[in-house]
UniProtKB/Swiss-Prot annotation:
Keywords: Cell wall, Secreted. This is 36 kDa cell wall protein. It is found in: Secreted, Cell wall. GO terms for cellular component: extracellular region. The keyword Secreted applies. It comes from Arabidopsis thaliana.
Amino acid sequence: KDLXHRDDKT
């Protein structure tokens, strides 16, 4: 979902 995409469960 997140366009940047960090170290998360997105």
